[in-house]
Swiss-Prot record:
Entry keyword RNA-binding: no
Name assigned to this protein: Enoyl-[acyl-carrier-protein] reductase, mitochondrial
Family, similarity comment: Belongs to the zinc-containing alcohol dehydrogenase family. Quinone oxidoreductase subfamily.
GO molecular function: enoyl-[acyl-carrier-protein] reductase (NADPH) activity
The protein's enzyme class: oxidoreductase
Organism, as annotated: Caenorhabditis elegans
Swiss-Prot/TrEMBL keywords: Fatty acid biosynthesis, Fatty acid metabolism, Lipid biosynthesis, Lipid metabolism, Mitochondrion, NADP, Oxidoreductase, Transit peptide
Active site feature: Y59
Binding site for NADP(+): 131, 157-160, 180-182, 249-252, 274-276, 332
Subunit organization: Homodimer.
InterPro entries: ADH-like_C, ADH-like_N, GroES-like_sf, Mito_Enoyl-ACP_Reductase, NAD(P)-bd_dom_sf, PKS_ER
Amino acid sequence: MQKTIRSQALIYRKFGDPLKVLQLETVEVPAEPGSGECLVEWLASPINPLDINRIQGNYAVRAELPVIGGSEGVGRVVKAGSGSRFKSGDHVTIFSANTPIWTEFGVVDDDELVKLDNRIPLDLAATLMINPPTAWIMLKKYVNLQKGDYIIQNSANSGVGRSVIEMCKALGYKSINIVRNRQNIEALKTDLWRIGADHVFTEEEFKGTSRQFLKSINVRPKLALNGVGGKSALQISSVLERGGTCVTYGGMSKKAHEFTTSALVFNDICVRGVAVGMWARQEEHLDEWNLCVDEVQKLAVAGKITAIPMEKVVLADHKTAIQKSLEGRSIKQLFVINSKASASHI
């Protein structure tokens, strides 16, 4: 009989309200990985919007039920099977967002794992494979930016937005950052300036001062990064230089993305879209993806990209964490999965 180990896992057996369908259960995991596999002790994983959409059944591709949740995180290899390219003690993350990760232990194919530099702090490592690569690809793939060039983005305080700010600073680009107005707006601006933002405006501020501001810097952005849609997409795409590019990676407003006829016809802007997870799995992009992962890790080790603010919770408190994620008024929730990776170590 095959030896197994018991593992606590967050599982949903039907799609629906995450507060109702997500349950903490005990599962049996093989104690010995097979050839080309690893037994991984998962340490930490965030709750991403993608996770909520999947549990609700709103994602483009529905997983086969039952499903262990999670789409991103960091783990430690406990045991590597024969022929594996990993070794015990390696820190790893997942290449595919379909790999179960809200569980203490799991057996994972080598092809679904990415080795991480063990020097990267665990909270950053847990959130390293979605937001920073998205920022990197958007900054590097679509426009040949040079030091001193300007980019503009909305949703600047999001995970992707913060990665964009830090990478622009590291690469020598200038960032114009648009955020929604809120009660603590001055504190938010100060935080974004702290991590490297060159300019920060609320949507209302930029609407009223964009002409004067662009005249003052005497240049227009070459690249606009759109994670919101609606009027916000119109706002940032309308100030691009002639022939500039607007890349859309999300639609937080849940409204159609708007672009003016003038920007498209007379300013000849290019509008693109990217889903980095899908892009990375296309064989023709493999070399570019590997370069992206290497560069992101170098920035992380050098301290040039940092972990976003997160609240650390254990799996047993998943309902509270999910509720906060659904409400959207709290900072991102990070599951500290294994008892050996207590909050004090992350």
